[in-house]
């Protein structure tokens, strides 16, 4: 099991945001803010956080309606981006590198477009540019029932059968087949604290998100590193998405051959190896 995160702290507000911050960091090094994917929590960075924190001030936080953060009446992409801005302004308090996965990548992208003075650079892990599209309610019905249930066994069963967003290292298709970082008994701790209303919001879709994403792609001037999986394995950056991302002012796209959507979870060493040169470039700029 990876090293645990530091003790959670709370940023008061609406909603409250649980965050994890070891402080420190080398002189002249940018702080790093980690933004997790949908249905996860800050523990999803446990295999990355300690490695980054040896050199950089590293901060992670639970998105609204996830983990230890508060629930909210609004689960639009705009709301998630506003929370990223709150973290930058009230906790990080200096220009940072934002590292976001999937939903977290989109929140980071929009925050960077809205507040360029707060962002040194972006690492976007398999950003889901098609976020506006609604999730399939049938695919998430059992999981939602499990999250809402007061019986832990109901959620455990739903998680064990829930399909992975991309195949595991040995071709696994469900969380129940996995061992290690994304084993079902670990992922249960992610899902159990998700607000069922978040799933309701995603199955309804988020039409305004499309314009938000397009607008941000035109506004962001900071350097951007996109880490992408293979679309055939569940990666979200297909040819059309890559074409859109390459309209960013300063962007590099790197593929993870043989990987899908869960890059840092399944390939932490490769993930770190890819972002370290990007961080050196930021230091020298």
Where are these regions (language model features)?
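Flexible "cap/lid" loop of the alpha/beta hydrolase fold
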Residues: 113, 120-156
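Conserved HGGG/HGGXW glycine-rich cap/lid loop of the alpha/beta-hydrolase fold
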Residues: 18-70, 279
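Conserved loop-alpha-helix segment in the C-terminal half of the alpha/beta-hydrolase fold
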Residues: 50, 219-259
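Active-site loop/oxyanion-hole signature of alpha/beta-hydrolase fold enzymes
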Residues: 21-23, 49-50, 59-99, 103, ...
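Catalytic histidine-centered segment of alpha/beta-hydrolase-like enzymes
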Residues: 259-268, 272
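Hydrolases whose catalytic domains are alpha/beta-hydrolase-1, hotdog thioesterase
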Residues: 107-111
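N-terminal cap/lid segment of alpha/beta-hydrolase-fold proteins
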Residues: 1-16
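Conserved alpha/beta-hydrolase catalytic His-Asp/Glu region
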Residues: 132-138, 152-218
């Amino acid at each position: 099991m990876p090293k645990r995160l530091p003790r959670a702290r709370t940023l008061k507000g609406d909603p409250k945001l649980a965050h994890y911050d070891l402080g420190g960091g080398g002189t002249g090094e940018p702080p790093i803010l980690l933004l997790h994917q949908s249905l996860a929590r800050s523990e999803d960075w446990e295999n990355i956080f300690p490695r980054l924190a040896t050199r950089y001030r590293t901060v992670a936080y639970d998105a609204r309606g996830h983990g230890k953060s508060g629930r909210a009446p609004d689960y639009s992409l705009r709301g998630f981006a506003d929370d990223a801005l709150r973290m930058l302004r009230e906790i990080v308090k200096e220009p940072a590198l934002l590292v976001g996965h999937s939903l977290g990548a989109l929140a980071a992208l929009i925050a960077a477009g809205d507040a360029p003075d707060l962002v040194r650079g972006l690492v976007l892990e398999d950003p889901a540019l098609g976020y506006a599209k609604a999730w399939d309610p049938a695919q998430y019905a059992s999981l939602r029932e499990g999250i809402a249930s007061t019986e832990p066994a109901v959620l455990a069963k739903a998680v064990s059968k829930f399909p992975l967003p991309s195949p595991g290292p040995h071709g696994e298709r469900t969380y129940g087949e996995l061992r290690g970082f994304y084993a079902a008994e670990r992922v249960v701790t992610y899902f159990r604290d998700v607000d069922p209303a978040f799933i309701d919001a995603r199955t309804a879709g988020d039409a305004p998100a499309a314009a938000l994403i397009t607008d941000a792609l035109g506004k962001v001037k900071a350097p951007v590193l996109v880490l992408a999986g293979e679309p055939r394995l569940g990666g979200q950056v297909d040819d059309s998405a890559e074409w859109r991302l390459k309209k960013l002012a300063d962007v590099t796209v790197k593929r993870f051959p043989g990987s899908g959507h869960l890059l840092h979870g399944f390939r932490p060493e490769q993930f770190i190896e890819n972002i370290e040169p990007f961080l050196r470039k930021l230091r020298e700029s």
